[in-house]
């Protein structure tokens, strides 16, 4: 006896719906080891994202400004396809990719309306890692 076609498999392959959003928020998380760029709409729903590691950089090259620039360009191109024209940029972290990610988004033709630093600053919370001696 033949099996009936599985509807669950057909549901998994459905076409992705493109959102048409004019303005959004770019969250740039710049750590010492990697840079993560997520572009969301105003409600916080992710439209696109990219990382330095996902852009093809491995090891210590992930933590370079150029890797952050390439990742920001990748996330920005997908966001432009979703209709993004204006962006607020929220930067978190002390990493080397902070400025270059913002410049890359600006060079794509996206208008940046606001740049905000949302790096969490402790009110003397956890003890930081010990200083490196080389």
From Swiss-Prot:
SUPFAM superfamilies assigned to the protein according to its UniProt record, in alphabetical order: Translational machinery components (SSF53137)
Assigned keywords, A-Z: Ribonucleoprotein, Ribosomal protein, RNA-binding, rRNA-binding
Naturally occurring in which organism (per UniProt): Janthinobacterium sp. (strain Marseille) (Minibacterium massiliensis)
The organism's place on the tree of life at top rank: Bacteria
Gene Ontology MF term list: rRNA binding; structural constituent of ribosome
PROSITE patterns cross-referenced by the UniProt entry: RIBOSOMAL_S11
Disulfide bonds: none
One Pfam family linked to the record: Ribosomal_S11
GO cellular component: ribonucleoprotein complex; ribosome
InterPro entries reported in the protein's UniProt record: Ribosomal_uS11, Ribosomal_uS11_bac-type, Ribosomal_uS11_CS, Ribosomal_uS11_sf
GO aspect biological process, one term: translation
Self-association and partners: Part of the 30S ribosomal subunit. Interacts with proteins S7 and S18. Binds to IF-3.
Similarity-based family: Belongs to the universal ribosomal protein uS11 family.
Its biological purpose: Located on the platform of the 30S subunit, it bridges several disparate RNA helices of the 16S rRNA. Forms part of the Shine-Dalgarno cleft in the 70S ribosome.
Name of the protein in its database record: Small ribosomal subunit protein uS11
Record flagged with keyword rRNA-binding: yes
């Amino acid at each position: 006896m033949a099996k009936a076609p599985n509807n669950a498999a057909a549901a998994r392959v459905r076409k992705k719906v493109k959102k048409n959003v004019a303005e959004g928020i770019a969250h740039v998380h710049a750590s010492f080891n990697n840079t993560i760029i997520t572009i969301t709409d105003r409600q916080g729903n992710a439209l696109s994202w990219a990382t330095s590691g996902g852009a093809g950089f491995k090891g210590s090259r992930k933590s370079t400004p150029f890797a952050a620039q390439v990742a920001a360009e990748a996330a920005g191109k997908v966001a432009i396809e979703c209709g993004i024209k204006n962006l607020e940029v929220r930067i978190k972290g002390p990493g080397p990719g902070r400025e270059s990610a913002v410049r890359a988004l600006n060079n794509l033709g996206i208008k940046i309306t606001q740049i905000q630093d949302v790096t969490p600053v402790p009110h003397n919370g956890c003890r930081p890692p010990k200083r490196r001696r080389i």
